[in-house]
Amino acid sequence: MTKKKKIRVVTGGVFDILHVGHIHFLKQAKELGDELVVIVAHDKTVEERKGRRPINSMYERAEVLKALKMVDEVVIGEPNCISFEIVKQLNPDIIALGPDQNFDVSALKEELKKKNINAEVIRIPYAYKSDVAKTSKIIQKIVETFCE
């Protein structure tokens, strides 16, 4: 009797100030397969892309994600880049993109093909919309409420 191969889903993101939008996204990503691996953005990458350091360090964000039932493994990304080497090592069957991740799916698929990474790319749409389902909105609300 042959053992069925587990379907591995890989996703990545900042996941700073974890909120209900993140939870809904991670649940949907997990439903795509058997194992969910999350690549947490390196602090330097966050600073470069968002123009600010994250509220929680990459180690704190990784620890919070590891505590979630739907997350099987957490890896911290490389500084200042999307590391295709990490993705290749993780050997995903599916790469799940969040609704606010501004990747050109066609370009990403081409790059994966060049790197010999055979994974399906799936963009997960917003499952939960609210003013508190976006980290920047949470920060803005905190500043408006407590800093004026």
Swiss-Prot record:
ATP binds at residues 14-15, 19-22, 100. InterPro entries: Archaeal_FAD_synthase, Cyt_trans-like, FAD_synth_RibL, Rossmann-like_a/b/a_fold. Homodimer. It catalyses: FMN + ATP + H(+) = FAD + diphosphate. This is FAD synthase. Pathway: Cofactor biosynthesis; FAD biosynthesis; FAD from FMN: step 1/1. Its cofactor is a divalent metal cation. GO terms for biological process: FAD biosynthetic process; FMN metabolic process. One of its GO terms (molecular function) is FMN adenylyltransferase activity. The keyword Nucleotide-binding applies. The keyword ATP-binding applies. Belongs to the archaeal FAD synthase family. It comes from Thermococcus sibiricus (strain DSM 12597 / MM 739). Keywords: ATP-binding, FAD, Flavoprotein, FMN, Nucleotide-binding, Nucleotidyltransferase, Transferase. Catalyzes the transfer of the AMP portion of ATP to flavin mononucleotide (FMN) to produce flavin adenine dinucleotide (FAD) coenzyme. PANTHER family: FAD SYNTHASE (PTHR43793:SF1). It comes from the Archaea.
